[in-house]
Each structure stands twice: as structure tokens, then as C-alpha cells.
């Protein structure tokens, strides 16, 4: 199953490769930096407990509305058009106190779908579909998934158990400006510290640079490549594990 949204830094190209690194004996699965949840949707290795988390409140609201109010969300999205004016209107109204959660979810979905590179900031001129035909399948997949909006350290400590598998896809080092939520150099170190103290297991996606390799030099590091979504050519990444 594919994600229902594109996302900056999304793992649609590497999802199967990441899933191939999954162990077979985990009882809880936690996506710490959920984003578009490409790995969650692509995996057929479902755990009894599954958690999706993201710091972006608009994104979390979209996931929750799709899970709990799918039909109402679909009806709301029907009223939106793929146009520059509609995009600007959605941007302006997203933070308005007069909008409902379902309206905000619909507007954020539109902003993701018709923006350039799913950045939600600039209108993408290429025609994009606002079809919601896959929403019912997504709703069913999310039935057993807990949806959280927590700081990554708080989340990891809350769900950490020996039988837990954490998938972490943080904002990449030196590319943090592309993400809506602030992520600092100190946060990269903070993530490293909490993963070093983990009782469970983790799989971590990162860009391949010297800073990352030095930070995680004590763990298993595998180099991979994917096509760059925002420019031509390939992008070097690493998959890091503690098992």
C-alpha cells in the first residue's frame, strides 16, 4: 500500500529496502517522525501495537480525521479545486480559529497535494489530482494505529520496551530548512543519545554525511541511494541499526 500523500523526505522509494531490515520478532512498531508514513503503509509486517507520531500538528490532524471521520473529510475535499487561488485561500485559513478539524484537514491535504514538491508553501503548476478514492483503504489500515503528536524523546521513552521496533526518519542534517517543524543540531545529538540508551531496536534513515557517520559510528551503517525528488540525480543515504 502506498501513502495517500507525497511528503518532503518521504520514503516511498526506499520503503521496501527499509522493511527488508525489519526483525521478525517485534511486538510494537513506532514511527517516530511519521511524515507521509510510507514505511508504515508499505509494510506487511504488522505488530500488535503500532504508533504513528509527528511533531506537525496539521499533519497529525489530517491523519486523525482520516482515521475517525473519513467520510466527512472526503465530502469536504470535494469542494476544493486545483488552483493557485484555492491554494492561497487554504494557506490563509489553515490557522483560522473559525475552522473545524475536518476543514483544516481538508485544506492541509489540498496544500500538500497541489504545492511544489509537497512543501505546502509554494503552488505547483503541474496539475495534481485531489481524488480521495483510496481513503477507505487508508482508514482501514489506520484502525489499529495510535496517532500521536509528541516530542521524539518523550515518545521514544514512553514506548520503549525490549520488544519494540522504532523507525526514525528525522529531518536530514543540513536540510532542516525544508521541514515545517524546527529541528536543530542539538536535536540530532539528542536523538542520538536517546537511541543509544534504547531497550528496544531501531532502524534510522539519514543522509550520508560525515556528521551522521561520526555520530553513529558504533552502529551498523549501510549506504543506499535514491532518486532526488527535488532535483535531478541521486541522493546518498544511510540505514542505521542497533541490531
Labelled PLM ranges:
Residues 1-14, 24, 57, 69-178, ...:
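SAM-dependent nucleic-acid methyltransferase catalytic core
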Residues 33, 56, 171, 207, ...:
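Anionic group-transfer/hydrolysis microenvironments
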Residues 184-243:
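Long, positively charged, glycine-interspersed low-complexity recognition regions
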